[in-house]
């Protein structure tokens, strides 16, 4: 229909994937990836940012560029402000992934659009012969449940709605820290519902 804007929402999307009876009272890692594009099959990771949260507080950070070993498309440079020179001397995903997995060992993994970011992590694990199972929480799915009045669930929109500051948008560790603050508020909102 001309002039109509529509959104397809999977109402059956899981909030938690592969639950192993872990608790959010345990440590969890909120992470974000910047990539060369929007495909978990064809694109590469160029930055990993993560924060570890214990008792509702950020206790540790993990942040690194990743050399994708392919050129970064111009549109991605414009979006992330990450260019080829910034990643040229960075370690490759083969070097970084084991360090990221060690950082997040035993933690629930939390991400925005978790199927995309975890898809890339899982694909890289598979490519390196690493067998790993993750408990995954998607903050976008959670936002849809807790804040159905929002028309959009982009990071900046949700951050503004819950009163969280977002600085250096599209830089992985800053987006992860913002997502962590949002998630802490979501956990409180869920507790208040009980």
Residue ranges and their predicted role:
Residues 121, 142-143:
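A generic structural signal for short hydrophobic patches within well-formed alpha-helices
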Residues 182-194:
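Acidic two-metal-ion nuclease catalytic site recognized across multiple nuclease folds
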Residues 24-134, 148-170:
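Conserved non-catalytic scaffold segment of RNase H-like nuclease domains
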Residues 125, 138-141:
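Conserved RecA-like helicase motor core of SF1/SF2 enzymes
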Residues 35-37, 141, 178:
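Short, glycine/acidic-enriched loop or turn micro-motifs at the edges of active sites
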Residues 1-29, 136, 144:
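Phosphodiester-processing cores and adjacent nucleic acid-binding clamps
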